[in-house]
Amino acid sequence: MRSLKLMFFLVSVLWFPVSLCYATATTHIWAPSTDVQPYKKWHLTSDFYVPTENNSDGTRADTITNLGLTVGVLPFEKLNAEVGFDHKSGYGTLDDYPWYFNIKVGIPENAYGKFFPALAVGIYDIGIKNDKTDYNVLYGKAGKTFSIDNVSLGRFSVGYFKGDSKLLTHNGKKDNDGALLCWERTMTEISDKLWVAIDYQGSRSSYGATNVGFSYKFSDNTSVIFGYDFYNDRDLADTYTVQMDIDF
């Protein structure tokens, strides 16, 4: 069944003309990217994660919703920063504490020469309830675009994250750190608006997942990502995700 779902998703990627430029402001599909919002630019996101089936124990996972707002706060060309917050729901009793905050600082790709990668460090999911929602996921990431004879191979990103050891667990044991990996590419051969990505976050905590997706950019400031999330903990149901992003 899972293989049929993946085949359907990949056929959708190839069949439908969808798009975006590199990533959303804070994430690729799932994990943080090296992108940072420009100074005074606001970024509104509305994300949905819909389970494809029951968890392995037979329980039905809730649909997760996330409404977030981020803004760029540094007026420099070679050093950017953004701050933001998210309102999340679908986590049962944790919905009593729905607010989470994030901060990121980054240096754009090629800022100090053509071989210089994009760099970013940050923290996200800073919750307001101690030992319940204070996941406090710290990360660092580097990304670089490669090409051969003016043909882009896409951007490759690699990084590392670490979160709260009491909350990022698997089977009762801490599993709170791991790799961040991503490949993404704007498919200019088809359209400058067509963007695809494969995104990975390590661990078998609830943060660990492999994600595949594409995006369509409806206008200069509005885009929608369509993706599929394979959780590293195979006891958890996979999810479809739809994410709308608006810059203003």
Task: Describe these PLM feature segments.
Residues 153-157:
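Alpha-helical interaction elements
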Residues 217-218:
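Sequence/structural signature of beta-propeller domains
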Residues 22-149, 162-164, 179-194, 199-201, ...:
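Transmembrane beta-barrel domains of Gram-negative outer membranes and organellar outer membranes
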Residues 1-30:
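Cleavable N-terminal export/targeting peptides
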